[in-house]
């Protein structure tokens, strides 16, 4: 039987594409543009897994489709190659992280090329290349000049095992680090911060302008966390001190019965009484060991200590105790809250635990039993009594402003971005600190500030990065003799990935980040495909940098990525025992269609789970390509289900996709191809062109493949295949299975040219219309015959055809026809006697 020899055909076409630079980005200004972007990978030691190609295949199909439709297509690939794993590996093995990274990139590139992706490798970028990070550093100097990069003494998330501080976004809910799962403690350090908060409103508003999944937009909205309310100032009794709280419910001020400061609040030591000093100091120490996430966990037991001080509630003059508690964060809002326990669950639990007053100020509920958190008319609130929420907020804000004790205020949950890392393997921050106390940016003419090569990359132990040990690099002297010290912190991995999509547009420019005209031509990115796990971090940071560059006049668009698509996860085969615990695949045996634990004999349930080394269910694409071919892997991953769904890997599904490609190969190579069109496939062919064109455009790749299968089934029933339809079909399948597409194109045309730029097939709308229709003929209400007739025949024509039918004539022979009812396009009913 004829089959598709992938081991011969796939390498042949990969070599052809490379030799002929088939996928070099088009520059014909008269053509429309299409910029298809993948989230570039971190080149880990493990190489690609089968989850990577899912998104890559989707953008590749779109890119091939758009080339055939006459677009200039920019479809690049590169490497997000700085970051902790390479450094950790280097420290463990004594190898240079640059060498390790280069080896990993070579392996990734080999694997990617084996899958037949149509990348323009002339545009490859690598974030660790000094020619690339020169511009990462240049962007930093612009942020610094604009006052958007600054140093501050801030409590950071310190990870002792990693020897570095990490951003809030990199701390897991259990208070450990995202990388490595190490304990995170809070400690104050001098750090570089980026003022992303200055862009909070624009980052929020401009989400309306992009075509992104609503779930991702909501995650960004929640992270930015805009709230409108009021600042209220409380004086501390018997002192000249005061503190400000932000509240979204100033209308409940009459119900504020105590105040809480964050343990780190600057006022705590100044207002704590001698009696309470020891308890407060101990509580502050314990709070410093917890992460922000652990401190704000709603489920945890409420803890706190009274400072001994009282504040004055400005609206009624009542004295209220001032506490410290770790659920209030110094970094959020003002680091102080007014507590209204009658109407807030956390405040209510705290008040009950420490026996504090609970005064209801909204009608409804029983505040002795639980906090009443719904809306109601105001009570116990003097001039607000009887008002609803909106009216009461407006009136209270007016009163606060008139009395000079508060004002209307908009706040954001978003914090400034902690930008420095105490590690070696990252972009050096281009700042010099001089002995006279000033700091300056390294001038553009001296960029890139190259990361020095060193064997000693262990953390310095002082909280500084290993660069602090390299005195030759570290110490500088100005022309006027003033001595200086380079910044020893490096940038986080997020830096290089915040702008890489711009460098692809003009990757070899030595004079500027990218040429203005080229940026105008290619921006924004038309489709960006990657995992939903980057919803907040990378996507928010990239949007922030893009807006800064827009303000500088570097980029012409407000937003970088017009459309975002998150592919689902490919899950591995795994098994669960009766306790719900996952069992590694090497501990499972199959007997009579069921699965059992090899050691305990317990019957197991098959349950898809994330692929992991521990479960031994990771599928390596190299193995799949070797056994089934790259085209099979591509078609299978697109046919598994909707692209955004998470679906379990299946060997049977893979075999099904392989069989389909073999059938396609046989259809084109063994069926008689003719120049005469019998018309038998007119409808299904034109339906297939229409469906595949529309569904690829909408990224519904699974339904497009299903339609290709429909065509193959129909074509196999015919003795001959019309040449134009054979060619058109091969063009339709080529973006999904490009090696097979190229091979079959040569079988049909012997052109010697790639199929990549052959104009995409069009369909004939008139051939989609049914010209014939089946109608039923009933006699006395029972179906006696079915006729295939021309569409839209008149009643008379239908009647004549029905009465002329042999079966009908046999049924009515010797009977009187009372009447004939003909319904066009449906039926003929004959009443006889």
Curated annotation (Swiss-Prot):
It is an enzyme of class 6 (ligase). GO terms for molecular function: aminoacyl-tRNA deacylase activity; ATP binding; leucine-tRNA ligase activity. A motif ('HIGH' region) lies at residues 41-52. ATP binds at residue 613. A motif ('KMSKS' region) lies at residues 610-614. Its EC number is 6.1.1.4. It comes from Streptococcus agalactiae serotype V (strain ATCC BAA-611 / 2603 V/R). Transmembrane segments: none annotated. One of its GO terms (biological process) is leucyl-tRNA aminoacylation. This is Leucine--tRNA ligase. GO terms for cellular component: cytosol. Keywords: Aminoacyl-tRNA synthetase, ATP-binding, Cytoplasm, Ligase, Nucleotide-binding, Protein biosynthesis. It holds the Pfam family tRNA-synt_1g. The keyword Cytoplasm applies. Belongs to the class-I aminoacyl-tRNA synthetase family.
């Amino acid at each position: 039987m004829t089959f598709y020899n992938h081991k011969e055909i796939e390498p042949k076409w990969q070599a052809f594409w490379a030799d002929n630079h088939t996928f070099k980005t088009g520059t014909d200004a008269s053509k429309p543009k299409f910029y298809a972007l993948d989230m570039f990978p971190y080149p880990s030691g493990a190489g690609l897994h089968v989850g990577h190609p899912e998104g890559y295949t989707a953008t590749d199909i779109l890119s091939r489709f758009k080339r055939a439709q006459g677009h200039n297509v920019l479809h690049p690939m590169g490497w997000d190659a700085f970051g902790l794993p390479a450094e950790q590996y280097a420290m463990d093995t004594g190898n240079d992280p640059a060498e390790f990274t280069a080896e990993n990139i070579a392996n990734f590139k080999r694997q990617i090329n084996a899958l037949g992706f149509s990348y323009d490798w002339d545009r490859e970028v690598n974030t660790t290349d000094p020619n690339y990070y020169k511009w990462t550093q240049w962007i930093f100097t612009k942020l610094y000049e604009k006052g958007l990069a600054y140093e501050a003494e801030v409590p950071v998330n310190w990870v002792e095992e990693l020897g570095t501080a990490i951003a809030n976004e990199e701390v897991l809910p259990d208070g450990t680090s995202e990388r490595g799962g190490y304990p995170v403690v809070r400690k104050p350090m001098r750090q570089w911060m980026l003022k992303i908060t200055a862009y909070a409103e624009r980052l929020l508003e401009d989400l309306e302008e992009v075509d992104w999944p609503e779930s991702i937009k909501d995650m960004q909205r929640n992270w930015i966390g805009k709230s409108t309310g009021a600042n209220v100032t409380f004086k501390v009794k018997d002192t000249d001190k005061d503190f400000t709280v932000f509240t979204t419910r100033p209308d409940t001020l009459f119900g504020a019965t105590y105040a809480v400061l964050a343990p780190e609040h600057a006022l705590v030591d100044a207002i704590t009484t001698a009696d309470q000093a020891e308890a407060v100091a101990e509580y502050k120490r314990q709070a410093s060991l917890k992460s922000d996430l652990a401190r704000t966990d709603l489920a945890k037991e409420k803890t706190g200590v009274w400072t001994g001080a009282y504040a004055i509630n400005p609206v009624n003059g009542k004295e209220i105790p001032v506490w410290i508690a770790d659920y209030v964060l110094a970094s959020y809002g003002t680091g102080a809250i007014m507590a209204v326990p009658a109407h807030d669950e956390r405040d209510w639990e705290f008040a009950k635990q420490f026996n504090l007053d609970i005064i209801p100020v909204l009608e409804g509920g029983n505040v002795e039993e639980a906090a009443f958190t719904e809306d109601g008319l105001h009570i116990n609130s003097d001039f607000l009594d009887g008002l609803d929420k909106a009216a009461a907020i407006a009136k209270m804000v007016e009163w606060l402003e008139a009395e000079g004790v508060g004002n209307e205020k908009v706040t954001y949950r978003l914090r400034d971005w902690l930008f420095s890392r105490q590690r070696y393997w990252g972009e050096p921050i281009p700042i010099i600190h001089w002995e006279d106390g000033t700091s300056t940016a390294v001038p553009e003419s001296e960029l890139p500030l190259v990361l020095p090569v060193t064997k000693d990359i262990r953390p310095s132990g002082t909280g500084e990065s290993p660069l602090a040990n390299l005195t030759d690099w570290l110490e500088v002297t100005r022309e006027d003799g003033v001595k200086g010290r380079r910044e020893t912190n490096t940038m986080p991995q997020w830096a290089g990935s915040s702008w890489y999509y711009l460098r692809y547009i003009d990757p070899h420019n030595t004079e500027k980040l990218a040429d203005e005209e080229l940026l105008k031509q290619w921006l924004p990115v038309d489709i960006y495909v990657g995992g939903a796990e980057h919803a907040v971090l990378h996507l928010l940071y990239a949007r922030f940098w893009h807006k800064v560059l827009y303000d500088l006049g570097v980029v012409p668009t407000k937003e970088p990525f017009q459309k975002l698509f998150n592919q689902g996860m490919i899950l591995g085969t795994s098994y669960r025992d009766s306790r719900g615990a996952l069992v590694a695949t090497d501990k499972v045996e199959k007997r009579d269609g069921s699965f059992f634990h090899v050691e305990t004999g317990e019957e197991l349930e098959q349950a898809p789970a994330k692929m992991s080394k521990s479960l031994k269910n990771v599928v390596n694409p190299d193995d799949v390509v070797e056994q089934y071919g790259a085209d099979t892997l591509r078609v299978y991953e697109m046919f598994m289900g909707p692209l955004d769904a998470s679906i379990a890997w299946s060997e049977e599904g893979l075999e099904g996709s392989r069989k389909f490609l073999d059938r396609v190969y046989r259809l084109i190579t063994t069926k008689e191809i003719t120049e005469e069109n019998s018309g038998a496939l007119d409808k299904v062919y034109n339906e297939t062109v229409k469906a595949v064109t529309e569904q690829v455009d909408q990224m519904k790749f699974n339904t497009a493949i299903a339609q290709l299968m429909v065509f193959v089934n129909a074509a196999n029933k015919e003795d001959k295949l019309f040449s134009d339809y054979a060619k058109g079909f091969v063009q339709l399948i080529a973006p999904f299975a490009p090696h097979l597409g190229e091979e079959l194109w040569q079988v049909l045309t012997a052109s010697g040219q790639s199929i990549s730029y052959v104009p995409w097939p069009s369909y004939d709308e008139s051939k989609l219309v049914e010209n014939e229709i089946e109608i039923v003929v009933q006699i006395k209400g029972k179906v006696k015959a079915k006729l295939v007739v021309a569409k839209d025949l008149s009643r008379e024509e239908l009647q004549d055809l029905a009465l002329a039918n042999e079966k009908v004539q046999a049924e009515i022979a010797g009977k009187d026809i009372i009447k004939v009812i003909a319904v066009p396009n449906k039926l003929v009913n004959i009443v006889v006697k």
